[in-house]
Each structure stands twice: as structure tokens, then as C-alpha cells.
Amino acid sequence: MQVELIIKNLKVYNSYFKKFIKSDVLINEGKFLHIGKGYEDRLWSENIIDGEDKYIIPGLIDIHMHIESSMTIPREFSKAAIKHGVTTVVADPHEIANVFGVRGIEEFIKFKGNLDIFYGIPSSVPSTSSSLETTGEKITHNEVKRLLEYDNIICLGEVMNFKDLIEDDDSNINKIINISKEKNIPLEGHCPKIQGVDLSLYIYRGVNGDHTQQSVGSLQEKIQNGMFIEMQHKSMTLENIKFLIENNLYEHFALVTDDVMADKLVKGHLDEILKEAVKLGMSIENAIYASTYTPARRMNLLDRGTIAPGKLADFILLDSIEDFNIYEVYKNGEMVFNRDKGLKEEFFEDKSKLDYRFYNSIELNNITKESLEVKVPNKYKNKVNCRTMKVLKNTTFTEEGEVTLNVYNNILQWEKSSCALIAVFERYGKNNNISFGLVEGEIIKEGAIATTWAHDHHNLMVMGRNISDMTIAANEVINSRGGYVVSKNNEVIAKLELPIGGIISDEPIEIIGEKLGEVRNAMRDLGYNHMNEIMSFSTLSLPVSPALKITDKGLIDVKKGSIVSLFKKGLY
């Protein structure tokens, strides 16, 4: 029998024994046909390659990520990710869904990047409820029924609305979960700091996976209660990895990325998480297992994730296993990336364009300096105690703090304080909401930052040390049809335009990455000190991430799931 390709003299990663075995690999019709020797009298090919003792492993599989986190479209994401050995992803498009609803999800599905992109149905759009945040659209159980008809929808995306899930049997999220259970698909979770009976109730409803930031304690409790853990960068600590290794928990977790910014994507993707696991003490064999085999099984992608007869021929050739040096990447048995020659461009032939309406979604007039004045109720005279959001350095969580500020003519006098002002403007033309908060911590010491890439509602959020710079940054975002802007001394010093829904761009990823890098550096120059400045700022608006966050409706006490006042009490 003639086969399409034979690669000889390889060190083949065997997922079942978690070790490398010297062998030949035979490929036919996009699948592995035979791994081994002794085939010459029965199988042959006109296309024989000497593997030169290289390592071959399955293509990497990222089962929890958001394409919108890279601020790009699926095609451009595919071109970037495949260079890093990623051949399959499961994307939760809840960012585009918050802006455009089902229409946005279907537009993403329409794009073909030739990387295998499967999708999870956004389960929490909005992430909380319409009483706590304004979004462009909603996803209800009716839309879920429609989306489940798509072949590449394979799971329910992260369930964030914990309060409605456990307190209201008839809530939208419970209806969504019940419909999804009928399809027997994995139900992905989002449950930071949920424990004890609350965690049991969460799992009891059917949600049995979590990707949020973990500790040794949360890993133990969640895994012993049957949860599958998806380890992202924030969870990659020495203590966590040691716990997973010592307890031999390789069947119960996978490595994932969750959010990879565009300036980071040009340098790495899931391969970087894999290498981080190895640096922290995990063997390369087990790190590969957690990036290929376990994620495939978690998502019922049983046709891939291992090098064995009948499985998809998605694989990576490595020069060196020690530094994970990628030489070539193959998709369905076809070489799509070579380190020296680059991408095989014809493999990425899709040229789909988005409808023009996706480029004009900001329904907001330019703001004025007066609109940024924080008016204080008459009952507070000269001084007032205010809540603050304290930014923490190594997490996207915040802590609630308190500061005393002067009041003059019913206007809060914050500019000479230790805090920055943060404001959220509703941008969908629905209610013209404006809310205010105060932020402290290792944040900007001057200037301002503004963005519509504000998770998950993506309203216009601006934070600054003076009203003038805040106005300039916010209006530049509006005039750019969305994006990220940093201003200082009444000038824009860094800008990334995100005209598609205010959250993504169709420019090449290299250009997006360069501009985002300039924004990041500008934030650092202004004093923002965090392991990920972009995500830190952009999640100040995420009302499912502890502890105090802000939306267009006001300050949100995340644990209580309720709006709280900026003002605590007056001091006369």
C-alpha cells in the first residue's frame, strides 16, 4: 500500500507510556497510519523524509482561551498560534458576544483559519445580570439552542454567574445548563474563591471544570470533588506544580492560556505555559501530556492528542526537547510552518471580511470635562469617606479600601489624593449611564488610560490622575471606534485602535502586538506596576472577579453580587 508520507528516524512521544520511542512515522489521508518499523514490505511512499533524530510530539491543544484576548480575528490568530505548535483550540467568544450577541459568535465561526477552532457557547452574557452591567447583547437559553446546532460548538463556556446558578432554579443560567446537559457536552466553570458548600452546589449543577487562579488548597478541594482543572499562567506557581506532581494528578488537569495579549502572542502561546511547567519541576513528558492528551479527552476530541494509528496527523517536530525548539509544525499531515521558511501562506487562504456594521459599534458622543466631575449628595458636606478599589500586583483581584476626601460645592476633590479616578461610560446608546470609582495601589501616577476593551461588558472605561488627560484619552478611544489609549500632559502618547466591536482589529498580529506593546510600556512609564498591566486594568470592570469592581451601573461588591455606593459616610 502506498502512503502519502514517511518520516524516518524520529523520537516519537507515546502518550500512553509518557515517553519517547525511536521509530518511523507513516501518514496517510491526514492521519497517522503506522508508528514503528518492519513495514517496508507492505507500506511505501514516494515522499520519504529523514527525521534526523528529531523529536515528534502531538500538536498542542488549548481548551480554554479567548481569541479576543489577542485583540485579533480568528484567521490572524491562527497564523500566529500555529507557529508555536498549537493545532487545536477551544475558544470561548464571550467578549464578542457581549458586544454583538449570537451575530458576533456566528461571524467568528464563519472565519476559517485552518487551525482547528472549536467553540464553547458563552454561558454568561452578561457576566452577571442586566441590573449590574449594560452589554450590547445577551445570550439566553433560546440562543443556546440555536448555537448547539453548529458542529464546532463542543462545550458550554465558563459559567460565571454563580449567584443565579445556586439561588434561582429558574434562572437563565440554569436553563442554559439544562439544555447543554442534553447534548452531553463539558460544562466549563469560573469559580475563583468558591469553596465548601458553595463549591459543591456549583458542581452539583453540572459545572465540573475551572480555569481560574488556583492555590494548593483550591486545587485539592476542587479535584477531590471531581473538577477538571485548567492551569493558566496565574496558577503556575512552584507550590501548585509540586502539589500536582506529588499527587500524580496528571489525569485531572490540562495546561491552558486563557488570555494571551497580542504583544505576547508574537512570542509564544501554549508552548510558553508548557515550558513554564517544566521550569517549575514538571517533566517534559508530563508537560506534553497536559498540553495534548488530557485536554483532548476533556473536550471529547478523541481523534487527536496522541500519535497513534487513526489519529489526526497534527504534530510538531522539535530539534531539542530541552528548550522546546520548534522546527516544523504539521496540520492534517501537511507541513504548515517551517522555522526557516516560515508559514505556508496558501494554507491560510481564507479572506473572509466582517460586515461593515461590526466596525461602527460605539454609540457615544465625545465626553466633556464636566461629565467627569464626581457629584456628591447634599447630605455629605465637607468631607466624605469613599470606597476604593485597591489593585494587587500579582492578580487581577482587587481589595476594597477606604479614603477620606474633601468635598467642595458638592464636587469630590480627588485629584490631589493618593487615588486615581475611574469612570465607566455606557457605549451602546441604551441608557447613557456614567459611574465613578477610586483606584489605589501601584497604578499610574500621572496621565490617563482609556479603553473599550473592558471585560466583559466592554463599555468605555477611563482612569486617570487628572480630568484633562482623562478627557483626551477617552475621546481618542471614541474617535478610533474603540481601542486602548494612554495620555500624558494633554497628549496621546500610545494608542491601539480596535475598531471591530471596540475590542479587536483585523490588522496583522505583528502590528497589533507592536501597538499594544507601546501602550503597555506607556502604562509602565506612568507608574503602573503589575505582572500584566493590560489585564489588570481591563478587569477592573469585571464584576465576577473579586472583590470590588466597576461597571456602568456603579461599584460592584462581587461576593454579594450587588451595587454599593462610592460614598460610605460623611464627616462634617
Curated annotation (Swiss-Prot):
Entry cofactors: Mn(2+)
Top-rank taxon, per record: Bacteria
Catalytic activity annotation: adenine + H2O + H(+) = hypoxanthine + NH4(+)
EC annotation from Swiss-Prot or TrEMBL: 3.5.4.2
GO biological process, one term: adenine catabolic process
Annotated keywords: Hydrolase, Manganese
One GO MF term attached to the UniProt entry: adenine deaminase activity
EC class (word): hydrolase
PANTHER family referenced in this protein's UniProt entry, alphabetically: ADENINE DEAMINASE (PTHR11113:SF2), N-ACETYLGLUCOSAMINE-6-PHOSPHATE DEACETYLASE (PTHR11113)
Family to which the UniProt record says this protein belongs: Belongs to the metallo-dependent hydrolases superfamily. Adenine deaminase family.
Protein known as: Adenine deaminase
Species for this entry: Clostridium perfringens (strain 13 / Type A)
Higher taxonomy: Bacteria, Bacillati, Bacillota, Clostridia, Eubacteriales
